[in-house]
């Protein structure tokens, strides 16, 4: 039986994002990274100092992952770049891999490293209203950026990995699809046995960004419905958390004990009824009563350009 709750929350920073995405907790830094895709901004919040650094970028950043040499691996419009903040507040950008999208009007969207340090990233056509199935899922590892591992996505999203690293989750958050799948993920990075995990047409919200907790349960942001949904590994809904924002975009576990859940959000074109418009675009912090897993840094550090 699923339980619905309205959790207590904190607002991480007064900053508001146009399209806040890709929250990423760094255990080594005890800091939260995230991006504003349309604001073209990279952020890092130092929890101990309660300060937020920000760096503007020339291109949209779809998502980020920790980089083994410090900073982050960023999936940008033209490809993957290693972004490394300097001592004087500048941001160095080193190209790592070139994007080969199916069309020129595309960008990377959602991404995350698996337990072996391979970076997985999806793509999408910029104009969602076209419902164009040219998006794909790629893998970046020591051999470079792969050919598409999954094709015919409209808005690839919801990437997450089981605690043992043997299952990959992927969703398509477009309103005409709204489904989550899981795959068997093998030691060599190959995928097999695609099957439906959850039909989100049966639940509130579109399946946006996701995370997996230490129990192996899958947390997904219900965009447009203002909820966080937790599914067991068998695909059963067991918790619903009601949020004060209508468009939660992605969640990530963090904090010293990995018992906090950070949630980024999107500022809607028009305020949604029943929600607190002053929090649109905010980054929230909840304590869901379960712990997450540390994020793995991308192990592939050599450029493939």
Describe the role of every protein-language-model region.
Residues 8-14, 50-56, 94-101, 145-151, ...:
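A short beta-strand motif characteristic of beta-propeller blades
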Residues 253-305:
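Blade-level signature of beta-propeller repeat domains, shared across WD40, Kelch, NHL, RCC1
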């Amino acid at each position: 039986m699923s339980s619905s709750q309205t959790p207590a929350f904190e607002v991480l920073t007064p900053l508001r994002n146009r399209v806040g995405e890709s929250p990423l907790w760094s255990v080594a830094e005890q800091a939260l990274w995230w991006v504003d895709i349309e604001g073209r901004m990279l952020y890092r919040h130092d929890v101990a100092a309660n300060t937020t650094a920000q760096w503007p970028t020339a291109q949209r950043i779809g998502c980020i992952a920790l980089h083994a040499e410090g900073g982050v691996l960023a999936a940008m419009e033209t490809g993957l770049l290693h972004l490394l903040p300097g001592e004087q507040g500048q941001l160095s950008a080193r190209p790592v891999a070139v994007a080969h999208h199916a069309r020129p009007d595309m960008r990377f969207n959602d991404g995350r490293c698996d337990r072996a340090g391979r970076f997985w990233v999806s793509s999408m056509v910029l104009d969602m209203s076209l419902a164009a199935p040219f998006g794909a899922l790629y893998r970046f590892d020591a051999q470079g950026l792969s050919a598409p591992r999954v094709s015919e996505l409209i808005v690839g999203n919801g990437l997450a990995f089981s605690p043992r690293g043997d299952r990959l989750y992927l969703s398509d958050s477009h309103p005409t699809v709204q489904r989550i799948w899981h795959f068997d993920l093998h030691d060599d990075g190959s995928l097999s046995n695609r099957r439906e995990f959850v039909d989100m047409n049966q639940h509130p919200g579109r399946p946006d960004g996701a995370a997996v907790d230490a129990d192996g349960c899958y947390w997904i942001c219900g965009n447009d419905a203002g909820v966080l949904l937790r599914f067991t590994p068998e695909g059963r809904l067991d918790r619903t958390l009601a949020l004060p924002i209508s468009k939660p975009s992605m969640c990530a576990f963090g904090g010293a004990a990995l018992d906090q859940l950070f949630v980024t959000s999107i500022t809607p074109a028009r305020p949604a009824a029943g929600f607190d418009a002053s929090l649109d675009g905010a980054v929230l912090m909840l304590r869901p009563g379960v712990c997450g897993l540390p994020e793995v840094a991308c192990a592939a550090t050599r450029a493939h350009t």
